[in-house]
Amino acid sequence: GYPLSYSLFNGSQYEGFTMIPMIDDFKQRFTLGADFVVVADSGLMNKNNVALLQEAGYKYILGARIKNEGASVKQWILSLEKKDKTSYEHKRQNGERLIVSYSEKRAKKEAYNRNRGIARLRKAYKSGHITKQQVNKRGYNKFLEISKDIEVSISEEKIAEDCKWDGLKGYITNTDLDAERVIAQYHGLWVVERAFRISKGTLEMRPIFHFTERRIEAHICICFIAYKVYKELERLIGINKIDMGVDHVLDAAKTITTIRIKMPENGTYFTKTLFLTEKHLAIKSLFDPPK
């Protein structure tokens, strides 16, 4: 989960068009070889980006929008045996493989979240707070439909159709890795998601209006370094086997005092760090000089 580098783009540029230049720069900067594999979720990808990855000869593992596949592929997916932790492959003519896995844990989570969303919809429907403007594909509003006489209702048919996909997850790859390895590599994206949560949460990173490009670059650099320091502290906590999270360590460290004393006899100075509480003592090893 260590951050290695970053690239800056104009704020008005669509982020879907920033990936290829960023990958090219990253590969060149670190002189990466042919075993370099791009892993990305479906939100960052479009047909143009996938085509550019193929043209550049990159290997990739991408999240698949299995509900948007063609009729024959969707029929194949829904006909698969739903056995926990099983995966199936469908080879495409362009050399890609569509890997579909099933997870009981994911199925239960998706069913639970959908039921909660539908419950909120039904409550809003009964109170008369649903309007035709809410008939869209955002969130659980996708279960709403509007009739010819402009009456909004909840579609039980759409709900039943959505249930069929519970627990199913798709991945697209042009690598030779086996399905289990592909899925494991893709699931590593949770580290990236956690990085964003830490940046916005613990580190409280926020956009700031700057007048010059130099100030923008400095702001991003400071944010990058702050997260890198956070990850290094996390690593040291693990090495020293400290049973505390980074946030709690930081809170405790803020209350530790170091004093500097001048000896009246000879004018020399010595410093001493005061560890006064149990929490202070628990993180004392972090203050020891490196060996």
Residue ranges, per PLM feature:
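Anion-binding and metal-coordination hotspots
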Residues: 1-291
